[in-house]
């Protein structure tokens, strides 16, 4: 019976002492994994940032192309009254005071340049 107690006590002491080293090793492994995880997260963050910048550049490029190719909107055609201070005549037209017809309206009209 005494040998069983001694054996149990010996196994208990060994388990506790080896368990402590395992705990320290586990803690060190966890620290290494978190450091690796941080570096992986930094890498993933940089990769995502690059993709977002590329996407933003493409979107800005499409916007600039669209504005270059879009036609002029809400402009006043030839022979239509316009405001002298805020002419909205289409391209190729100028807001001028009429020479012959329309002088009694005291208004400006869009004419070709």
UniProtKB/Swiss-Prot annotation:
Tissues expressing this chain: Expressed by the venom gland.
Signal peptide, first to last residue: 1-21
Main localization category: secreted
Chain residues in the propeptide: 22-74
Domain of life of the native organism: Eukaryota
GO terms for MF: sodium channel inhibitor activity; toxin activity
Keywords: Disulfide bond, Ion channel impairing toxin, Knottin, Secreted, Signal, Toxin
GO CC terms, sorted: extracellular region
InterPro entries the record matches: Toxin_22
Disulfide bonds: 75-90, 82-95, 89-110
Localization (cell): Secreted
Its biological purpose: Probable ion channel inhibitor.
Domain statement: The presence of a 'disulfide through disulfide knot' structurally defines this protein as a knottin.
Family: Belongs to the neurotoxin 14 (magi-1) family. 01 (HNTX-16) subfamily.
Record protein name field: U11-theraphotoxin-Hhn1a
Protein source organism: Cyriopagopus hainanus
């Amino acid at each position: 019976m005494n040998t069983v107690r001694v054996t149990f006590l010996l196994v208990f002491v060994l388990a506790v002492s080896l368990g402590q080293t395992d705990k320290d090793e586990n803690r060190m492994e966890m620290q290494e994994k978190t450091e690796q995880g941080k570096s992986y997260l930094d890498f993933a963050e940089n990769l995502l940032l690059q993709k977002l910048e590329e996407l933003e550049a493409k979107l800005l490029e499409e916007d600039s192309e669209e504005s270059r190719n879009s036609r002029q909107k809400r402009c006043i055609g030839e022979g239509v009254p316009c405001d002298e201070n805020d002419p909205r005549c289409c391209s190729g037209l100028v807001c001028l005071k009429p020479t012959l017809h329309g002088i009694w309206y005291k208004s400006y009209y869009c004419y070709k340049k």
